[in-house]
Amino acid sequence: MEDVIAPISKELLKAELTEEKRLRMTNRSHNQIYIITAQDSPNTMKEIGRLREIAFRAAGGGTGKSMDIDEYDIMDNPYKQLIVWNPEAEEILGGYRYILGTDVRFDEHGAPILATAHMFNFSDKFLKDYLPTTIELGRSFVTLEYQSTRADSKGLFALDNLWDGLGALTVVMPNVKYFFGKVTMYPSYHRQSRDKILYFLRKHFADKDNLITPMKPLLLESDENELAALFCKDSFKEDYKILNCEIRKAGYNIPPLVNAYMLSLIHISEPT
């Protein structure tokens, strides 16, 4: 495993984070959201790669390289990087990378050039009817020092600040209707708890049209009849209470991104 690179100079970062790259201020903590690419901000890209590698290694993953930067970050038509910047501490709190569906290119076989293309099969219906109004998200991270264990409000709202950025994308790109991407659960996560989350998601968020299907489906190791008996309620909210209780009993938590995505879908679908 390679050593992670040293932090990039704050002066180099500030020189690249210019006004035209600033998307907006965050709703909380007075942080700033920027959009950059490896081409227009190479030093910032290196710092993102450094911070991603540190955060992912701490969670049981990581590339093992000195920076988490791949071909999708640096290709001719690169993914854009959405980052939250703390102007007081002059450091990056977290980020996502993304690509707009209308910017996606296709290879000689007609397959989309996407970071998730080696994991999923995309139906013709998805490519035709959904991709043009979709943003693919990936590589989400919160810098280690700003994760939820940090006591001050800057750390407390780091994830909220990222949501601000995603919301702002839909304002500046009003044709966008959907986000999609993968969520990583590392092998160290409790297997029975993982199965409960997976069963719950399949029950309440099934892709009935098979818009996107995994090349290697994740198989349940637990007895499916037992899971069906456990999650026997008619509503998401009642089953969710059971799920949350079961995961906590095992000494774990529902992964924050899984939790946030599920709850955001429910809030969107509920009438106001």
Model-assigned labels for residue ranges:
Residues E2-Q39:
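Conserved N-terminal entry element of GNAT/NAT acetyltransferase domains
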Residues D3, P7, A38-G49, L156, ...:
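Generic detection of long, well-ordered alpha-helical segments
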Residues M25-D70, K80-L100:
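Short amphipathic alpha-helix that is part of the acyltransferase structural core
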Residues Y72-I83, F106, S269:
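A short helix-loop-beta-strand connector motif used in the catalytic cores of GNAT acetyltransferases and
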Residues D76-K80, E88, I92-L93, Y130-P132, ...:
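Short, well-ordered loop/turn elements at secondary-structure boundaries
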Residues D103-L265:
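Acyl-donor binding region in acyl/amide transferases
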Residues I266-T272:
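Conserved small/polar residues in nucleotide/adenosyl-binding loops
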